[in-house]
């Protein structure tokens, strides 16, 4: 029997429903050429709502081919594995409230983010996915495929996804009669993830520290330090940055 003692975030709470959010966009190398399109559609939707967008991972590379000269010190080659590290640090520190991510299929980024406590990432192909995930599962990240099915009208689909994701109060349930049960299960899931995982700093220290260093690019650090509310995570990031 699971005894619920309180979630990482209170699913469906009034604070979460009404708050102005800080949203991080994270792209990896294979789809980074689409970053300007994704960023533009995200800002077009959420900035009029009062939300702030941070572009914390890759921008468009210098050339479309995956070759060394495509990347720079400020825009290095990041994979979906790096995105999980970024998301875990930003969400658990309180530096951001929500993450939009993805990769070619969306599956790699989904798995990478969901490894970590405090991160509940859903898979989103079309607007109904975004709406139902946030009403039923009340998570804090969405992974989108940016190659598979990303053809004519993709920018319109992104716009509609972001509108459904951020245009309604979260955790209201679908159907509405299921709200109480769905909110309870979403909260228990967050608690279970914390219970079965290592504490985040311990988990990050167990990783290849070179990979962690690679994830801490300047755009990420600007966002992290501007909003970090967790002294332990800040101290860990400080130590990694100092060792670079």
Describe each region flagged by the PLM.
Residues 70-97:
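Short, structured active-site "lid" loops
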Residues 15-45:
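N-terminal beta1-alpha1 ligand-phosphate binding loop
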Residues 50-73:
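A short beta-strand-loop structural module common to alpha/beta enzyme folds
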Residues 95-105, 121:
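A short, small-residue-rich loop immediately preceding and capping a beta-strand
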């Amino acid at each position: 029997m699971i005894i619920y003692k309180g979630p990482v975030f209170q699913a469906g709470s009034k604070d979460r429903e009404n708050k102005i959010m800080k949203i991080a966009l994270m792209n990896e190398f294979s789809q980074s050429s689409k970053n300007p399109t994704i960023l533009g559609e995200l800002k077009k939707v959420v900035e009029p709502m009062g939300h702030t967008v941070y572009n914390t991972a890759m921008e468009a590379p210098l050339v479309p081919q995956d070759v060394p000269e495509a990347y720079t010190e400020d825009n290095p080659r990041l994979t979906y594995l790096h995105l999980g590290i970024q998301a875990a640090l930003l969400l658990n520190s309180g530096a951001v409230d929500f993450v939009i991510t993805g990769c070619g299929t969306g599956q790699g980024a989904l798995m990478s983010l969901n490894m970590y406590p405090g991160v509940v990432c859903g898979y989103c192909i079309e607007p109904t996915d975004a709406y139902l995930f946030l009403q039923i599962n009340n998570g804090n990240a969405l992974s989108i495929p940016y190659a598979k099915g990303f053809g004519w009208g993709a920018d319109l689909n992104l716009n509609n996804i972001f509108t459904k994701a951020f245009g309604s109060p979260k955790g209201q349930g679908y159907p509405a009669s299921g709200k109480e049960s769905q909110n309870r299960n979403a909260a228990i899931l967050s608690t279970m993830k914390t219970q079965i995982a290592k504490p985040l700093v311990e988990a990050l220290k167990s990783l290849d520290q070179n990979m962690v260093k690679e994830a801490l690019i300047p755009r990420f650090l600007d966002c992290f330090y501007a909003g970090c509310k967790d002294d332990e995570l800040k101290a860990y990031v400080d130590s990694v940055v100092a060792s670079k």
